[in-house]
Amino acid sequence: MEGKEEDVRVGANKFPERQPIGTSAQTDKDYKEPPPAPFFEPGELSSWSFYRAGIAEFIATFLFLYITVLTVMGVKRAPNMCASVGIQGIAWAFGGMIFALVYCTAGISGGHINPAVTFGLFLARKLSLTRAVFYIVMQCLGAICGAGVVKGFQPNPYQTLGGGANTVAHGYTKGSGLGAEIIGTFVLVYTVFSATDAKRSARDSHVPILAPLPIGFAVFLVHLATIPITGTGINPARSLGAAIIYNKDHAWDDHWIFWVGPFIGAALAALYHQLVIRAIPFKSRS
């Protein structure tokens, strides 16, 4: 059904303006759907920008693990929760670092910092398989190095305080942990798609420079909800880096959850955004 023009208030403008609503607001006049990324693009391998983007993902994930693992260890080291930043502080550390790092790297690599985000964007044909695999490898290497530097600086506390490794908490089943990871990653990747949607930035409803803010805030909220269940993975590189450096049996017992869950959540978010949210037809005018 075609939308009609109605009086609406746009932004902070106190004067009513005549604006089309519904599908009439979404013509090719203000937006053109970009072509999907090629499935495989070997030409990228000869481009410096390709490797620069991978280095940016490595450094960002390195810094992410370094700061967040130290924060988790600081909370566990405290004699009681009141003597530390607590769960809220951990959530702020994760969300704040994602906000800062996405802001710093978005213009270079897209600011993924998470294999699940990369996987979701790949399914939506936002990047090629070549770039997706390279990003995931660099993210995992960065996470391993970040956790490794923390252990290098504080070897004994790192081992005794758990090294920031993700495990399913006592009292929760594997299914509960898997569900928490699926839903948590869905929230994150859905937010990434919404915050970076070119269709929105083509109109006045979106300010692209603010995209890191909702992404970081989504990470913060998911951590508040799921830290008591799994310690919050929603990022396979983060879980892998901490598990490899910590290297205790219980850190590997349920490690599959922190890959399967985020990848399922990312796939569901990509499908939902592409098939439901973006499934509004664009009317072409001759």
Swiss-Prot record:
This is Aquaporin PIP1-3. The chain crosses the membrane at residues 55-75, 82-102, 133-153, 175-195, 209-229, 257-277. The modification N-acetylmethionine is found at M1. InterPro entries: Aquaporin-like (IPR023271), Aquaporin_transptr (IPR034294), MIP (IPR000425), MIP_CS (IPR022357). GO terms for biological process: response to water deprivation; water transport. Belongs to the MIP/aquaporin (TC 1.A.8) family. PIP (TC 1.A.8.11) subfamily. Residues 76-81, 154-174, 230-256 are extracellular. It comes from Arabidopsis thaliana.
